[in-house]
């Protein structure tokens, strides 16, 4: 074997087509390698076009192709999205491209996903956190996705109707069977996730390795209890609504949409609030400081700076928006820029943090009760990728 052949065999891989292909470990408890931005498939389909805009199958396939061509491998969907079209079209795309092994697919169970065909009230056990709902949902997701395994399965929404042991035992059984590799949970109070992971650890079951929740510069409630909980249990955080339901838009972009006859399509309302407009303007200021126009790239960069193991979900329907958002991976926001963005909102950690303070591992500073006793120095936890001690992008 020649030196060139040895280098080709054991040398490093070539640089990726974009930073989307510079993969990251999902979490301390899940070693799978994923793209730093996850493609959200909520809009892949045309069944919900009245609320989310239309996307025919050709456009969906083109978007998936563009994401993969840029190095992306991490796709987020759910059993109910677009009345089951989302999973179905993704399955067709992977089958046609013969790329299932290259993709990391996350899907979800919990909400009623069959009423669109069976009728309201006639699909009662197709929803819920219980074992029967889980069994049928995974069976159907595997069929629609045309695969024999799901990389990450989320509980979509906690509904308070199923015990922690029933849920975790049933999920662990799927992992043992090889139908699911990693477990995630969405839209659930921190105390429930803590109880579930504690049960799993004590019983030798599979714990949740990733949490999915709503987070952006204006909606920071996740930082209060969920972010510390995720750190404690070694969980990643995948983020939806990272772009303010599509309402973080510059004046230029809004004018362009108006000229093209497009409004704001958003689940949480179709008009910018005064605060969303103010945040859009602030994002634009930071974007200009970095020599770009994309306010959405700055919104994503903000989340990527906040903590390690954070993976924003990027949705939308246009390939140009995908490329704009990939710019976020090359941005490094300063501490001052992050504080400037956060000053637009009115988030407050509240009790008990306003009394006991926050973890010195995050701030490097003693809490009031500790400072009262003696001067102290603290080891700080790891920063987000790209953020060193001298360029602190983490919240302080």
Swiss-Prot record:
Class of enzymatic activity (EC top level): oxidoreductase
Keywords assigned by UniProt, alphabetized: NADP, Oxidoreductase
GO molecular function annotations of the record: oxidoreductase activity
Similarity field: Belongs to the aldo/keto reductase family. Aldo/keto reductase 2 subfamily.
PANTHER family linked: ARYL-ALCOHOL DEHYDROGENASE AAD10-RELATED, NADH-SPECIFIC METHYLGLYOXAL REDUCTASE-RELATED
Assembly description: Homodimer.
Name by which UniProt lists this protein: Aldo-keto reductase ausK
């Amino acid at each position: 074997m020649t030196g060139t052949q040895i280098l080709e065999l054991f040398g490093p891989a070539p640089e990726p087509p974009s930073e989307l292909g510079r993969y990251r470990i999902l979490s301390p408890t899940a070693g799978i390698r994923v793209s730093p931005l996850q493609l959200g498939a909520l809009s892949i389909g045309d069944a919900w076009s009245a609320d989310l805009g239309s996307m025919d199958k050709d456009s969906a396939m083109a978007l998936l192709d563009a994401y993969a061509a840029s190095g992306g491998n991490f796709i987020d969907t759910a059993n109910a999205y677009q009345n089951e079209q989302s999973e179905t079209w993704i399955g067709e795309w992977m089958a046609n491209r013969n790329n299932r092994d290259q993709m990391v697919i996350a899907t979800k169970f919990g909400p009623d996903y069959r009423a669109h065909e069976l009728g309201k009230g006639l699909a009662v056990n197709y929803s819920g956190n219980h074992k029967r709902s889980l069994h049928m949902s995974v069976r159907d997701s595997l069929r629609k996705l045309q695969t024999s395994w799901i990389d990450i399965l989320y509980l979509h929404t906690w509904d308070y109707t199923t015990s922690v042991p029933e849920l975790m035992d049933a999920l662990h059984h799927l992992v043992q069977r090889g139908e699911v590799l990693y477990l995630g949970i969405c839209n659930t109070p921190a105390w429930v996730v803590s109880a579930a992971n504690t049960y799993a650890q004590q019983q030798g079951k599979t714990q949740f390795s990733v949490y999915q929740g709503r987070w952006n510069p204006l909606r920071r409630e996740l930082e209060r209890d969920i972010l510390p909980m995720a750190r404690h249990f070694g969980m990643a955080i995948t983020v939806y609504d990272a772009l303010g339901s599509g309402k973080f838009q510059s004046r230029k972009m809004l004018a362009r949409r108006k000229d093209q006859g497009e409004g704001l399509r958003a689940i949480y309302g179709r008009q910018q609030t005064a605060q969303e407009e103010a945040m859009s303007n602030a994002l634009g200021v930071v974007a200009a400081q970095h020599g770009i126009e994309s306010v959405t790239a700055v919104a994503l960069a903000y989340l990527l700076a906040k903590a390690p193991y954070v993976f924003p979900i990027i949705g939308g329907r246009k390939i140009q928006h995908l490329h704009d958002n990939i710019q976020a991976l090359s941005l490094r926001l300063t501490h001052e820029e992050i504080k400037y963005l956060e000053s637009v909102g009115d988030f407050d950690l509240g009790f008990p943090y306003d009394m006991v303070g926050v973890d010195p591992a995050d701030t490097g500073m003693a809490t009031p009760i500790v400072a009262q006793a003696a001067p102290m120095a603290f080891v700080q936890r790891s920063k987000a990728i790209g953020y060193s001690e001298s360029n602190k992008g983490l919240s302080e």
